[in-house]
């Protein structure tokens, strides 16, 4: 029976608990939260099996720990969990990854603890916060980014990967700095812009009669996330400020280019710009929905920390989708094999070439889904 610790029983923590208890076979969930009312409600809703009075109590015997704390508190909470020892893999759910890794690396924790931390970020959520809004199916089909490092223990990474898969998520490895740049582009910048748009409209539509009824659906769609959870987004903006500022600079340059076309009355350039946006949007959506046949590869590797992370990150950076994975240690525990199932036409061949470039031999296995 797998014991899972959830530190922070809110929307995400509660949804993890519900999904794990109902989908991960044999899982029990121990919850801890600084707010006793959240624990009580989590127990009533079936999100946790046990209310714990401390992080130490929640981690007792746990195999996986989910840190579901505000971004500014993730590193401190993760450190407290890692200090409990054992072979528990500790992960988080925040949308900023590099700052957490850097803070943990500078915390004085030994490598034996740091190698048990794998940053995580599910691309799922809701506008309403709190465990009352938690849902078992929140992560169904959702990408769940994982940021393993050269320290990561392969067996612990696989344990986390399989648990997330059983909860309906699609785990995907990504480097922490790449993750933060990506989130700055597709999540954090849109939140900044939504707030700017609302502020601009509020200053322009000064009369109450010119309020929201004067706006169209485009404005409502573009500003849906404006004003969302100010303390949460304050922490996200500050923690990922370098990446967000870079994106704002690029955005300002793009706006300047549009302004120049408008000043010049260059309708043809504006039309091409809009057409390019439509093409790019379609390409991005097609990439998100891409699937294809699934093939299995076996990769013999030595039993050393970081190898699973190295391979998973290399394939992810090449755009190869790992749909499942398994580790098979040799009896002497000095070596073993990684089984990888990759999706898409030609992905198996590309994956084998990439793995070979890392110094490992990858062999296709007949009888896959594709």
Model-inferred region functions:
Residues 77-132:
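Rossmann-like NAD(P)(H) cofactor-binding subdomain of soluble oxidoreductases
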């Amino acid at each position: 029976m797998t014991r899972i610790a959830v530190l922070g029983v809110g929307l995400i923590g509660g949804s993890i608990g519900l999904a794990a208890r109902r989908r991960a076979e044999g899982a029990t969930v121990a919850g801890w939260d600084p707010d006793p009312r959240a624990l009580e409600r989590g127990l009533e809703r079936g999100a946790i099996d046990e209310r714990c009075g401390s992080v130490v109590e929640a981690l007792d015997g746990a195999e996986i720990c989910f840190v579901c704390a505000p971004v500014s508190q993730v590193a401190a909470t993760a450190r407290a969990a890692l200090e409990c020892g054992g072979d528990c893999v500790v992960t988080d759910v925040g949308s900023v990854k590099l700052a957490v890794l850097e803070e943990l690396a500078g915390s004085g924790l030994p490598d034996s603890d740091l190698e048990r931390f794998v940053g995580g970020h599910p691309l799922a959520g809701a506008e309403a916060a709190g465990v009352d809004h938690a849902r078992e199916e929140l992560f169904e089909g959702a990408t769940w980014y994982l940021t393993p490092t050269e320290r990561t223990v392969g067996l612990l990474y696989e344990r986390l990967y399989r648990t997330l898969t059983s909860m309906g998520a699609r785990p995907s490895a990504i480097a922490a700095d790449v993750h933060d740049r990506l989130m700055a582009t597709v999540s954090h910048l849109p939140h900044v812009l939504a707030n700017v748009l609302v502020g601009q409209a509020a200053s322009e539509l000064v009369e109450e009669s010119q309020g929201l009824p004067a706006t169209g659906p485009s404005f409502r769609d573009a500003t849906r996330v404006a004003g969302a959870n100010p303390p949460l987004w304050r922490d996200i903006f500050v923690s990922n400020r370098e990446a967000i500022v870079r994106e704002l600079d690029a955005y300002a340059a793009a706006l300047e280019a549009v302004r120049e076309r408008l000043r010049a009355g260059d309708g043809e350039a504006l039309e091409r710009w809009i057409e390019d946006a439509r093409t790019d949007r379609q390409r991005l959506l097609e990439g998100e929905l891409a699937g294809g046949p699934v093939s299995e590869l076996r990769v013999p590797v030595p039993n050393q920390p970081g190898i699973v992370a190295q391979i998973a990150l290399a394939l992810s950076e090449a755009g190869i989708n790992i749909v499942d994975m398994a580790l098979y240690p040799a009896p002497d525990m000095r070596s073993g094999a990684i089984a990888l199932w990759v999706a898409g036409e030609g992905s198996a061949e590309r994956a084998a070439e990439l793995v070979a470039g890392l110094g490992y031999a990858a062999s296709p296995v007949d009888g896959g889904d594709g």
